[in-house]
């Protein structure tokens, strides 16, 4: 496994600990809420939650913001634009767009683990326009065509 060093900046509203892997084989690191006051996410509503950190990713890397399964299954709280993408050239505060799909209001307290961040390498492509594409068994079938 390759370890890549990434610069991280604690902002004024930062509190708690830096994102870290919970276990040796964890893919994601928990992001911590850095709100000064509790934030209520009403049922069916969306809120932008600060984390108090900014990062400088190397070229060809992105950060993906994903839901925490416990918040989703227990409270219906998930990341609205999952996965959210943080590009390598973004230097602002990482914020998480949470949506409450539950039936009750949910309160985000300072220091709460609200999402996971996964750092991933990506490839850039160059389009090659073509009048035809190689045939496959699946063809153009989609949206449940391989099974329900």
Curated annotation (Swiss-Prot):
It is an enzyme of class 3 (hydrolase). One of its GO terms (molecular function) is magnesium ion binding. It comes from the Bacteria. InterPro entries: dUTPase, dUTPase-like, dUTPase-like_sf, dUTPase_trimeric. Its cofactor is Mg(2+). GO terms for biological process: dUMP biosynthetic process; dUTP catabolic process. Pathway: Pyrimidine metabolism; dUMP biosynthesis; dUMP from dCTP (dUTP route): step 2/2. Substrate binds at residues 68-70, 81, 85-87, 95. Its EC number is 3.6.1.23. It catalyses: dUTP + H2O = dUMP + diphosphate + H(+). Keywords: Hydrolase, Magnesium, Metal-binding, Nucleotide metabolism. The keyword Hydrolase applies. Belongs to the dUTPase family. This enzyme is involved in nucleotide metabolism: it produces dUMP, the immediate precursor of thymidine nucleotides and it decreases the intracellular concentration of dUTP so that uracil cannot be incorporated into DNA. This is Deoxyuridine 5'-triphosphate nucleotidohydrolase. It comes from Rickettsia peacockii (strain Rustic).
């Amino acid at each position: 496994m390759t370890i890549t060093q990434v610069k991280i900046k604690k902002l004024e509203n930062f509190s708690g600990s830096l994102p870290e892997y919970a276990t040796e084989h964890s893919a994601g690191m928990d992001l911590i809420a850095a709100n000064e006051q509790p934030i209520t996410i009403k049922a069916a509503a969306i809120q932008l939650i600060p984390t108090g950190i900014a990062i400088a990713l190397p070229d060809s890397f992105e950060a993906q913001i994903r839901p925490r399964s416990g918040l989703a299954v227990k409270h219906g709280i998930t990341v609205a634009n999952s996965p959210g993408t943080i590009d390598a050239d973004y230097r602002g505060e990482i914020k998480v767009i949470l949506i409450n799909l539950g039936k009750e209001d949910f309160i985000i307290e300072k220091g709460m683990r609200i999402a996971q961040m996964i750092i991933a390498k990506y490839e850039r492509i160059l389009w090659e326009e073509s009048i035809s594409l190689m045939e496959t068994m699946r063809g153009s079938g989609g949206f449940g065509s391989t099974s329900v």
